[in-house]
UniProtKB/Swiss-Prot annotation:
TM spans (from-to): 451-471
SUPFAM superfamilies, alphabetized: FAD/NAD(P)-binding domain
Membrane topology qualifier: Single-pass membrane protein
GO cellular component terms listed in the entry, alphabetical order: membrane
Binding sites annotated in the UniProt record for FAD: E35, G49, R108, D308, G321
Keywords linked to the UniProt accession: FAD, Flavoprotein, Membrane, Monooxygenase, Oxidoreductase, Signal, Transmembrane, Transmembrane helix
Pathway(s): Polyketide biosynthesis
Enzyme class: oxidoreductase
Keyword flag Transmembrane: yes
Domain of life: Eukaryota
Pfam families hit by this protein: FAD_binding_3
Active-site residues, record numbering mapped to chain: Y216
Protein name according to UniProt: FAD-dependent monooxygenase aurC
């Protein structure tokens, strides 16, 4: 369409940044990517989950087939409680039946390689470009890097992660123009209560192909996914000894990751396999804090932040990367409409600001519930508190597809690139998923019946333990230590 007079400066060659670049490419909008590292590839061994809401956009971009080739299929999910009680579901199969696209887990390093390889013009990537400042001009915006280079454009997009320089510059500029644009209290809402050791291990001797296994434990959980061949991805998500707030969230060393993993080595994983057996076969791992928060203000003038820079969630729901892909598509939709409606002239800053405000408002509304769900699931799987312990052990297994149904609603509510026709694979024929359905299988009345039965079971268990306890009802739950 020839609308190359509008230029986007993307800061960060992340999954979010490269997905946005692919979207802009398809929309015919000019862009450049500034990456502070010498290359864009993450450390191997860190897994990322792809859900249908992210995969359908990759399919629109012609990327999904390459990504899918990296994926080892998952058919079942096994959720184990500390006492060995197991909830077995066919959720991965239900996802494919419902959406035509699977839930898959792949190596982030390999995913980034695929995204990068699909660019025909790699000259738009500029490596070793650490951003130091952003400045607004009369009709444009400029970005200066540590080596003294300056890049000019119409919009700066911060796709540079949770430690975003673009976000910091946006706050600085916003507070100069309007004191109180972002307060110290708002900044401190970005916090970490949990951390994770992400890793990948070779096959455990005698162990065949893996499925998705979740092991709930008090103050931590294990997550396992099939990797290439008989290799296995592992996540050890654990509660920190205190809540850390921005900017004082620590970064962890390999030694700290080793200490954590060795401390949980005797906990069971699957049949006779202990975690120490997997840890002994490790190929690569890293230990990181799990920051959580979504900021309300994502933009100021010609600056917008997307992905982890403004919407950071824990990995338990597997939606951080997928919702970032959604945001890249949604931002592109808005920019394309803005640019085409003003062509051949550039849109004014006010018009751009209105587009960014609409994008900000819609994405915040979309992700607010997802963030709440992710926070809850993280704490549920770490059995953080009596109510969550009771729900996980005595209620969840009797609620059918409740949690998976919630995932279905999240997936079905995602957006797409509105200027690329949908195919059957990218969700053209996805059936609606109203709130009272879960996977289109269980009606709300079925859930109510299941929940009533489960609640009765909980009541009976609590009363029975209370009657057996000399201390009475108050110790009925607290005394229920779970052991293997």
């Amino acid at each position: 369409m020839g609308a190359y007079s509008f230029r986007v400066i993307i800061v960060g060659g992340s999954i979010t940044g490269m997905t946005l670049a692919h979207c802009l490419d398809r929309a015919g909008i000019d862009y450049v990517i500034l990456e502070k590292h010498k290359d864009i590839f993450a450390e191997p061994g860190i897994s990322i989950g792809l859900m249908p809401n992210g995969s359908r956009i990759l399919e629109q971009l012609g990327i999904y087939s390459d990504v899918h080739a990296l994926f080892e299929g998952i058919k079942k999910i096994y959720q184990y409680m500390p006492d060995g009680y197991c909830i077995e579901t066919d959720s991965p199969v239900n996802i494919v039946d419902r959406f035509g696209l699977p839930f898959c887990v792949i190596d982030r390093y390999q995913f980034l390689k695929v995204l990068y390889s699909k660019f025909e013009d790699k000259s738009r990537f500029h490596m070793n470009k650490k951003v130091t400042s952003i400045c607004h001009g009369k009709s444009d915006v400029s970005v200066t890097t540590a080596d003294g280079e300056t890049y000019h454009g119409d919009l700066v997009v911060g796709a540079d992660g949770v430690h975003s320089v673009v976000r910091s510059e946006m706050w600085r500029i916003g507070n100069l123009a309007r004191p109180g644009f972002v307060t110290e209290r708002e900044k401190s809402e970005l916090a970490a209560e949990f951390a994770c050791v992400f890793g990948v291990a070779k096959a455990v001797p005698g162990q065949g192909r893996w499925e998705h296994i979740l092991r709930y434990n008090e103050d931590f959980c294990f997550m396992f996914f099939p990797a290439s061949g008989t290799d296995v991805f592992f996540n050890v998500i654990y509660k920190l000894n205190q809540k850390y707030v921005y900017p004082d969230i620590p970064r962890f060393t390999k030694e700290e990751g080793i200490e954590v993993c060795e401390s949980v080595g005797d906990f069971p994983v699957w049949e006779d396999v202990k975690f120490r057996d997997i840890w002994a076969q490790r190929i690569a791992f890293t230990c990181v804090p799990l920051e959580e928060h979504m900021f309300k203000n994502w933009h100021h003038r010609r600056i917008i932040c997307v992905g982890d820079s403004v919407s950071k969630m824990s990995p338990n729901m597997g939606q951080g990367g997928n919702t970032a892909i959604e945001s890249a598509a949604a931002l592109t939709n808005g920019l394309r409409k803005l640019v085409t409606s003003n062509y051949p002239d550039k849109p004014s800053e006010r018009q751009l600001s209105n587009t960014l405000e609409t994008f900000n408002r819609n994405q915040f509304k979309r992700l607010n519930t997802v963030h709440g769900d992710a926070r809850y699931v993280t704490r549920l799987e770490a059995l953080d508190g009596t109510l969550k312990r009771v729900f996980a052990r005595y209620v969840m297994g009797h609620c059918g597809d409740l949690l998976v149904g919630n995932l279905a609603r999240i997936v079905a509510g995602g957006g797409v690139l509105d200027f690329i026709p949908l195919t059957a694979r990218s969700g053209k024929d996805w059936p609606p998923c109203p709130w009272q359905h879960s996977w289109g299988i269980s009606e709300s009345i079925d859930f109510c019946k299941k929940f009533a039965v489960a609640s009765l079971i909980v009541l009976i268990v609590v009363l029975a333990r209370a009657l057996d306890s000399p201390a009475g009802l108050s110790s009925g739950i607290r005394s229920s230590s779970w052991s293997f």
